[in-house]
Amino acid sequence: MTTRLAKEHYMSKYLFLGKINQEYISGMLQNPDQDRTAVLKNLAAALGADFHSLEFTRGAYDVVCICDAPDFETALAMKTTVIRGGAVASIDILEVFDFNQYAHKAASVTSGYKAPAA
């Protein structure tokens, strides 16, 4: 799914699913008033992305971050910058897409496609 940025520029929405490590927990327990949201907003802005939210979760992932970015490379730069900091163990990136738009495109070409013969 894309959001319109300017006349000809669009940004895609990305979900960052992260797993924090002991270093993150130790740092936050030493200074629980740290505003990690502000840090991520600044990182996103420096790369031309828009930060939306940072949520801590229970389950397979400890944290979910939502941002709009102009391309996957920007999202990947955000991921590697955070990972390089050492307090996050891993981050998976999911790119949101418009299923209806995909379905229209796929439907427009499926009748003309033939699978390879066995």
Regions found by a protein language model. Give the residues of each.
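A compositional/biophysical signature of low hydrophobicity enriched in polar/charged and small residues
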Residues: 2-118
